[in-house]
């Protein structure tokens, strides 16, 4: 995992003080608001408002009146209508919200959700023909359809009326439908353009019902679920919808949602937007990823508690299968990358595999992107030699533009700067890999691939009280464009490091101004840290109140930890001694002893390098390795002593090593028999200096 570049906001102290005084918010909350450019009482009131009166008139959306007229007419005539959805959480919740409402009004309404694995995204000609043959006379799309001009034309030619509801970007020429309702229409004057697909569907039922508040009361939980899962900005109408939806979620009348909460172990627990993102959405998405989106749709539409419980259990089982497929592909890719990936040269990873599950390669892309700190494209090749791929990017590398430079190789592709999809023939994948590598080499530096961590403000230890932390709840619900606040505190002393869950996570005890803070860092073990007990560090974190056995305490949830300036200064002093040694300069006996490793030090470094190397390679941030070895061996190994150990091994033909872009890169060399380091010049030189 590459280091992050911190971007720390510096809210104006006087503005924070005035905002706190005039609004009654704590200085901590006021500092977060000010850091985000919200530094007047009115701006704060507008930004934080969850007042349902802020919901706009649904008829403000272009063509909404036409959509309502067409749907009412079809209901009155008793003709069959079908809601055409999508297989992700947004599409499923949009489908279920609209179908449930229309059925409650007596509509003959069915739904159709394409199979991710066989149909792909969006409308298809075979689906249009099938639906017409089954008696469909009105097709209503949700979360799809805005660019399906050809498919809509087919539906119209067959004799179906079409109402499109979508939230994706529009092309210049809209489909020829009876109504096209999309908050991103260029000719739309609706005041909020960031609705989810389920948000647009919700607006449609509000228009049909003529009572927005009653529809919010009835469907806010499903609409919030789709809105958060689709990573929509939690501002404006979305903030109101999600705030109301989270209230409803804990007491939901939707039997399917209730059973899913139970199966996920979340019933009677505090529910937040994170609950949706990390607990509910993965289970619902798993159904779509595994080609069984209809399970999730049935779950949210059924009125039978026994059936709902069975479906919720099946969704959780599908999620386990998804995790299994994901981990299988991840292990395969990691094995190959240990052989093929060169961290010194490769700025993009492009891998293809036969039979990889198309529904999960996007998740694996994201995990590899985080692990290696570079863009990743994974391609699943089927038995017909057709590759379907997903890509994820990082930093400032625009993946869509990179793919556009290779567009002659694709059958189709699409996406945006940070995520994309593609279809390519297997015999063109090697050329694609070569061209993407060349593109990355000329369009991005390693420094530009470093991910940024945006920090709202630096805090003082006295600010971290339960009262102040609880006051931050006014900022909720969190999500896109209203992220959970990130704070940082500098020059904290690491008192204790405790591995958790077989060293998959770590708990830290940090000291600042005599105050002890408990911190937890998920997804990293003690052996992967770049610091040890006793080091001084800067920590970036979320703040929360931890409740355990009736006891409440302040807890820091770590986002990142970096060595403080004083540690870098200490390293530099040692490195100056090491550089003097390398330049044949004089060292005092005391200085030489600081650099001179004994046998146990050499063994500790060798053991760490050989155990951590993957296929003979180890790449770590240049200041981290000495501290990791020190942590594991409980020995005093500074950065200069580490380099001397590496020099000894290099002289003996055991390794080679060098630096690039802030990374220390070690390559193990094959050798036979017992390694002999007795002839090391650097070791002999230090021993003579040390006396």
Task: List the predicted regions and their residue ranges.
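Short alpha-helices
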Residues: 97, 175-228, 600-602
